[in-house]
From Swiss-Prot:
Organism listed in the record: Helicobacter pylori (strain P12)
Protein's UniProt name: RNA pyrophosphohydrolase
GO cellular component: cytoplasm
EC number(s) recorded for this UniProt protein: 3.6.1.-
Keyword field contains DNA-binding: no
Domain of life: Bacteria
Family of the protein in this entry: Belongs to the Nudix hydrolase family. RppH subfamily.
Any one Gene Ontology BP term: mRNA catabolic process
Taxonomic classification: Bacteria, Pseudomonadati, Campylobacterota, Epsilonproteobacteria, Campylobacterales
The encoding gene: rppH
Keywords: Hydrolase
InterPro entries with a match to the protein in the record: Nudix_hydrolase (IPR020476), NUDIX_hydrolase-like_dom_sf (IPR015797), NUDIX_hydrolase_CS (IPR020084), NUDIX_hydrolase_dom (IPR000086), RppH (IPR022927)
Amino acid sequence: MLHKKYRPNVAAIIMSPNYPNACEVFIAERIDIEGAWQFPQGGIDEGETPLEALYRELLEEIGTNEIEILAQYPRWIAYDFPSNMEHKFYAFDGQKQRYFLVRLKHANNIDLNKHTPEFRAYRFIHLKDLLKKIVPFKRQVYRQVIAYFKREGYL
């Protein structure tokens, strides 16, 4: 039996500073794939905890890690890379992720160009519009984590 190899990764569902009064989530468009919108995410370095990786990745990708952690998805959740997708992680079949639900403290601190840019644009959108914007191969994972945070009363 062939075992799949997944890259350890963290992902952030970032609520706007207006949370809980407004249920708007941050999404960003990848710089390398036009029209590919997603939550900020990134690999966990060796010796790093998922929480440490979260703070580092947010600083690298959106220029700020001034967040309030609201909750964490209780398990690792994995997705496979599409077979037709050229990706830079050829040693992996996909990614296994730890999801964090966070609230951004100050939206005006977002700077996509603070480090090497990974995103070309960002926006806050209403939760009900989220899945329409996300690439198809990530939708099931997004559905699952959003449903969990809804059941827990966060969304």
